[in-house]
Amino acid sequence: MIGERNASVYICPMSGRFTSRMRLACSLAVSWVFLLAVHAPTHAQTVAVFDFELIDTSVEGEIRGVRSDEQARLGQLSLQLRERLKDSGRFSLVDIAPVAAEARASNLQGCGGCDTRLAGRVGAELSITGTVQKVSNLILNMNIYVRDASSGATLAAMSADMRGNTDESWFRTLDWLIRNRLLAPDYGVRR
């Protein structure tokens, strides 16, 4: 029937004009498109993700030396971090193979910014490094650092304590840092 309101039709049958509901729906749709366009990154930042390093200050480390299970975990942490950053779409990973041997031979946390110089040499805008600090088999800490490759400035530093020297504790801690710090919206943004 003409003039009857149909929930799925928002054009007035008499005048053929938009009703106030239709205007509201259109303006909301346009607003959402605008907001998404404004907050969408202009490009994925290029990043060099270096392998995690172990800082072992435990008595066990002094007595027994390097543990193969911890070395394997460090490699897996690095792979998982790279994969998650790539999958996020916010970062474009740069191949660090040309500088990998030099990075492995350095203490990236104590080399006076060599990580940013290495990142710059492979064309990255950012350098990401990470450490696992082991106090004992019970008390460990994971850190991730994001630095600007051109200036060397630290853009973000994130840290989380973990309990237990197991695969599960290491990977859950990395997952938490990625979700709640590294890829969290507006983490570290000063307003």
Regions found by a protein language model. Give the residues of each.
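N-terminal secretory signal peptides that target proteins for export/translocation
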Residues: M1-M22
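Bacterial N-terminal signal peptides
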Residues: A25-A37
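C-terminal/domain-edge helix-coil "capping" segments
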Residues: A44-V59, L79, D87-S88, T116-R121, ...
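Bacterial Sec-dependent signal peptides at the C-terminal "C-region" and cleavage site
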Residues: A37-Q45
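Secreted/luminal cysteine- and crosslink-motif detector
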Residues: P13, S27, G112-D115
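Glycine- and acidic-residue-enriched helix-capping/strand-helix junction motifs
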Residues: E62-Q76
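Short, solvent-exposed, polar/charged sequence segments at loop or secondary-structure edges
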Residues: K86-T129
